[in-house]
Regions:
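A structural signal for short hydrophobic beta-strand segments in well-ordered beta-sheet cores
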Residues: 25, 157-159, 222
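Extended, small-residue-rich solenoid/repeat segments and analogous flexible loops
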Residues: 215-300
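Conserved beta-loop-beta/alpha segment of the NTase-like Rossmann-fold superfamily
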Residues: 61, 69-161, 196
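Long terminal segments
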Residues: 341-371
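N-terminal glycine-rich phosphate-binding loop and ensuing alpha1 helix
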Residues: 1-62, 72
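Short internal beta-strands
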Residues: 50-54, 142-143, 336
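A structural motif detector for beta-strand N-caps
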Residues: 258, 264, 269-277, 283, ...
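Catalytic-core segments of class I nucleotidyltransferases/pyrophosphorylases
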Residues: 111-113, 120, 126-133, 146-149, ...
Length: 371
């Protein structure tokens, strides 16, 4: 079966992370978020996967290659061009990306799945496909009910009692929302839908293709199915995704490394004296990291590979990226540390009394010389 992963966006809402990596490559429990999707698609028989890429495309293409490591075939549709030896990203919209692939080689010749490359799911895709076929719809959206106070964060789907979609609301206020069913970014299309998408034009699935499907009066269904859905739309979602997954709240996802103490996992060759530190799980400490005596770590916290936490540092409910150093005055809570950056869940820099974050750095630069 065939699927498409949408991976061409710039990820502006998760900056500054996406200055250095495309959004689908952001690590969750040490693994790119898109890798969870590829694994899940493979489990449900989707063995031919096209990925549209644009922003920092080589990072995605270089990591996933042709897909054989996951038992699938992966191909890429690059949205952009080369100018003066520099790659210029020019995304054409989510629906435009589908049209571009189809116009090039006619890839979509049967029912196909489209998923956003920035979410982790455990949805029974096989069951959802069956519901789509049974309904006879030309297009289906997988929806999920969310608490009413969360509705303004999503695109709302309004449907009748049979599941036929009637209208959409884009991030309505709590009072204006006509439904608590939201668009999860998981779509099933018949190839005929592609005829509605204009050629060589930036065209979006949610804001342009879906209204067109409604206008044409085509069978358009919402499929509600129970599943865990961790959407990484913004930095706060990314932080929450790590928190939830470290607590084991997504089926089929296991912590990497070795569980050396209850709810504490490590990679290889970690330097730590357990009698001289305070660590309360769930916590992961990456390979070749050094945790000095006097450090406090409270979970859920992820410490990446090659990190250096100096005596006196305190880390709580945070994500510390690979090769980060936190100095003795560093107190990090509900935050993300990477390079010389330390930001809260909203991407705001955490202030330092001295003005500069001299307690955050690259561990490879400031690691003390080996004795």
């Amino acid at each position: 079966m065939k699927a498409m992963i949408l991976a061409a966006g710039k990820g502006t809402r998760v900056r500054p992370l996406t200055h250095a990596m495309p959004k689908p490559m952001i690590p969750v429990l040490g693994k790119p978020v898109m890798e969870y999707l590829v694994e899940h698609l493979a489990r449900h028989g989707f063995d031919q996967i096209m990925v549209n890429v644009s922003h920092l495309a080589p990072a995605i293409e270089g990591y996933f290659g042709d897909g054989r490591r996951w038992g699938v075939q992966i191909g890429y549709s690059f949205e952009g061009h080369l100018e003066g030896g520099e790659t210029i990203a020019s995304p054409v919209g989510s629906a435009g990306g589908i049209k571009r692939i189809q116009e090039f080689g006619g890839f979509f010749d049967d029912t196909f799945l489209v998923v956003c490359g920035d979410a982790v799911i455990d949805l029974d895709l096989s069951a959802v496909l069956r519901k789509h076929w049974q309904s006879g719809a030309a297009a289906s959206i997988v929806v999920r009910e969310v608490p009413r106070d969360r509705v303004p964060n999503y695109g709302v789907v309004v449907c009748d009692s049979s599941g036929r979609i009637q209208s959409f609301q884009e991030k309505p206020s709590v009072d204006e929302a006509r439904s608590q069913l939201v668009n999860t970014g998981i779509y099933i299309f018949e190839p005929s839908i592609i005829d509605l998408i204009p050629k060589d034009q930036d065209f979006d699935i949610g804001s342009e293709l879906f209204p067109l499907i409604l206008k044409k009066g085509l069978a358009f269904n919402a499929i509600e199915s129970p599943f865990n859905w961790i959407d990484i739309g913004q930095l706060s979602d990314y932080w929450e995704a790590n928190q939830q997954m470290m607590r084991g709240r997504l089926r089929g996802v296991e912590m990497p490394g070795i569980e050396v103490r209850p709810k504490i996992w490590t990679g290889l060759n970690v330097k730590i004296d357990w009698d001289e530190v305070r660590v309360e799980g769930p916590v992961y400490i990456g390979s070749a990291s050094c945790i000095e005596p006097g450090v406090q770590i409270y979970g859920p916290t992820w410490i990446g590979t090659g990190c250096y936490l100096e005596s006196g540092a305190r880390i709580s409910r945070s994500i510390v990226f690979d090769y980060s150093r936190v100095g003795p005055t560093g107190s990090v809570s509900d935050a993300l540390v990477f390079g010389r950056n330390c930001v809260d869940q909203n991407g705001e820099s955490i202030p330092d009394l001295g003005g500069a974050l001299d307690w955050v750095a690259d561990s490879r630069e400031l690691m003390p010389p080996a004795k």
